[in-house]
Design a protein with these regions (language model features):
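Conserved MFS/SLC helix-loop-helix module at the cytosolic interface between two early adjacent transmembrane helices
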Residues: 68-107
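Helix-breaking motifs and short loop linkers at transmembrane-helix boundaries and internal kinks
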Residues: 49, 81, 101-107, 136, ...
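C-terminal transmembrane helical hairpin of 12-TM major facilitator-type secondary transporters
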Residues: 282-328
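Flexible cytoplasmic inter-helical loops of multi-pass small-molecule transporters
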Residues: 2, 189-213, 398-403
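Cytoplasmic helix-loop-helix junction between adjacent transmembrane helices
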Residues: 110-152
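Extracytoplasmic gate region of multi-pass secondary transporters
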Residues: 38, 218-270
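Helix-loop-helix hairpin linking two adjacent transmembrane segments in secondary transporters
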Residues: 137, 145-196
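Interfacial helix-cap and linker-helix signal at transmembrane-aqueous boundaries
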Residues: 44-45, 76-77, 160-168, 246-247, ...
Length: 403
């Protein structure tokens, strides 16, 4: 039995509007706080006298634990539903941030970071399946709104955290948002309805495995996941090294470089909201390909530009690639069979987050070989490949998947 609903409802207003707002605010906090740690690393490194390798390892812990939660969360979605998982994510993430307050050693900082990665890892798969089944008529716009809110959080919260840290210390910057996580947990519980289709029992293990294997042989899913992985690979590398590149190679101050990174997320937020509307009108595959193609020139231009204004404009425009996220998420989730949707989506997210996280490693190796400029050309080439893949995506026809 399908869980799809809302075939003819409005994106805003009513119960669906309240649900969309609560999920968007939650993602604003979850994604934004994931980029606060990198922003505060210089301060944390000074306190604990860390090497760059140790500081980088802290970020690795955050993303690895986040990726590790994607599959088990997807499995849980098919059994307990999104409501409980979204609330648990907000509660656990808030508790993890409190752990930073009582972390006198770097080892405990790593523990807190791992806990935060685990807590935030519950949010993504649950958010995806909830939006897909609730906003069938406005799927692209709904995903764009929520992921756009996350991009605003990624732009705003790191900047705010550095201001708080300068006055009150980095621990205060981490725990300042804990009350907001608590409030979001309450609102999510009130606005997200439980599933009414027997989700709590879930399909049998053997049947789930068979459905997963069948899903991963679907050409649409293979192409979509490949394109998504290539785009995420570039995004991870870009956000990890844009500030370093602008500071070391283009000789901008770290403050200016950090502001350009924030500009990237602002452009990403705007393009995500607009991309969803365009896809709802012109189709997902053509829109995805167009976004990927438009994302190539900024990557090619960066190594060939000088001057603060030019670098600020082009560096910010690299955020256009972020609008691929909500569209490809909607395409993949909407293609998966209903009865294993959460499980399959969680497994796929674990896969492309794990592979995509290697982008920063590859670019880091190239940078140490004095090939920093060439790294951006590599990212541009991979983005072109993603565009070609998106052009071959068939129109989506939702399978029922349930009997």
């Amino acid at each position: 039995m399908s869980t799809r609903s809302g075939a003819n409802g409005s994106l805003v207003g009513g119960s669906r509007g309240r649900l969309l707002l609560s999920v968007a605010v939650g993602w604003f906090l979850v994604l934004g706080m994931r980029f606060v740690l990198p922003a505060l690393l210089p301060t944390i490194s000074n306190e604990f006298d860390l090497t760059e390798a140790s500081a980088g390892f802290a970020v690795t812990v955050l993303w690895v634990t986040y990726a590790a939660m994607q599959f088990p969360t997807g499995l849980a979605v098919d059994r307990v539903g999104e409501r409980l998982l979204l609330v648990a994510s907000a509660v656990l993430s808030g508790l993890a941030l409190l752990t930073y307050w009582v972390a006198p050693t770097f080892t405990l900082v790593l523990v807190a970071t791992g806990l935060f990665g685990l807590g935030t890892g519950l949010y993504g798969p649950s958010r995806g399946t909830l939006l897909s089944r609730t906003f069938t008529d406005r799927e692209g716009a709904a995903f764009g709104t929520v992921l756009g809110a996350g991009s605003v959080g990624a732009a705003a919260l790191p900047l705010l955290a550095t201001l708080v840290a300068a006055v009150y210390g980095w621990r205060a910057a981490m725990v300042a948002v804990v009350p907001l996580f608590a409030l979001v947990a309450i609102v999510l519980w009130m606005t997200v309805p439980p599933r009414d289709d027997g989700t709590h029992e879930g399909p049998g293990v053997r049947r789930t495995v068979r459905r997963l294997v069948a899903s991963f042989h679907d050409r649409r899913i293979v192409l979509a996941v490949t394109g998504a992985t290539l785009m995420l690979f570039g995004f991870q590398a870009l956000t990890a090294f844009l500030v370093t590149y602008l500071h070391q190679v283009k000789h901008l101050s770290t403050g200016t470089a950090g502001a350009i990174l924030s500009g990237l997320f602002v452009v990403g937020a705007l393009s995500q909201a607009g991309g969803g509307l365009v896809a709802d009108r012109f189709g997902q595959s053509r829109t995805l390909a167009a976004i990927a193609i438009v994302s190539v020139p900024p990557l090619l231009a960066l190594p060939n530009l000088d001057g603060r204004l030019a670098l600020a404009v082009v560096g910010s425009l690299t955020g256009v690639r972020m609008s691929v996220g909500p569209l490809i998420n909607a395409y993949i989730v909407g293609t998966l069979p209903d009865d294993v949707e959460g499980t399959a989506w969680g497994l796929l997210r674990t896969g492309f987050f794990a592979i995509g996280s290697l982008g920063s490693t590859v670019v880091g190796v190239l940078a140490t070989m004095a090939l920093f400029d060439e790294a951006f050309y590599l990212l541009a080439a991979l983005t072109v490949l993603a565009a070609v893949i998106f052009l071959t995506l068939p129109a989506r026809a939702r399978p029922s998947g349930a009997s």
